[in-house]
A protein has these predicted regions:
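Alpha/beta-hydrolase superfamily serine-hydrolase fold, recognizing
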Residues: 2-231
């Protein structure tokens, strides 16, 4: 299951579809690409509920779709990483889909925006702290509905029992520190974590698909999926 980024309010763009196809080919898996309702029209919890409903549908229909329930993972980039992590949390909480893995690429994890990187990168390219603040204002304009951990996974008081995670953070990204903190919190809760702290990159760097670093990191993500599906 893949949930695209875009600040919860931008619909998916072509390069993310291309990467999803690469993950499918490289990891020899089916990728279900979810088109959730975006926060410009429907704030939290609607985008999250759409993603969780899609996950439930795939789980329920796995036999018809010829999918192995033992090898269902969630993944996403940026805001999509938030949605993936939140789906993993709710699946654990409700005893729903038994996920084998979560792929979190420069994820948004914390609505408090108090980290050092959030203070440092206020005007960085493609994404920065000011845009991040506007994103949260839009996404949570109706509040968190008593489910803060599903809006911002770092607010969960219990991260135990979650599936293994690949967490990727970029050096010059306002989200760097909260992504790394989420990885460390998962690890402290007993979750197996592969943290990739990528030097010399910024949020959304892989938009430039032809760059060697983009190719290398897509390959690392694919390898992480391959390993998760073979365990």
């Amino acid at each position: 299951m893949y949930f695209h980024g875009g600040g919860f309010c931008v619909r998916d763009v072509g390069y993310i579809h291309r990467y999803a196809a690469q993950y499918a080919q490289g990891a020899r898996c089916v990728v279900v690409f979810v088109h959730y309702r975006t926060a410009d029209a429907a704030p939290f919890p609607t985008p999250f509920e759409d993603c969780y409903a899609a996950l439930g549908w795939v789980w329920d229909n796995a036999p018809k779709l010829r999918l192995d329930r033992a090898r269902i993972a969630v993944g996403g980039d940026s805001a999509g990483g938030t949605l993936a992590a939140a789906c993993a949390l709710r699946s654990r909480d409700e005893g729903g889909s038994k996920l084998c893995f979560q792929l979190l690429v420069y994820p948004v994890t914390d609505s408090r925006m108090e980290t050092a990187s959030m203070q440092n990168y206020t005007d960085s390219p493609l994404w920065n702290a000011e845009l991040n603040r506007k994103m949260w204002e839009l996404y949570l304009r109706d509040g968190d509905h008593g489910m803060p951990q599903y809006a911002a996974p770092m607010l969960s008081d219990d991260l135990s029992g979650l599936p293994p995670a690949y967490v990727e953070v970029e050096e010059f990204d306002c989200l760097h520190d909260e992504g790394a903190a989420y990885a460390k919190a998962l690890e402290a809760a007993g979750v197996a974590v592969q943290l990739e702290d990528v030097k010399g990159t910024f949020h959304g760097f892989d938009f430039f698909a032809g760059k060697e670093i983009s190719k290398a990191m897509v390959e690392k993500r694919t390898q992480a999926l391959q390993q998760a599906f073979t365990l």
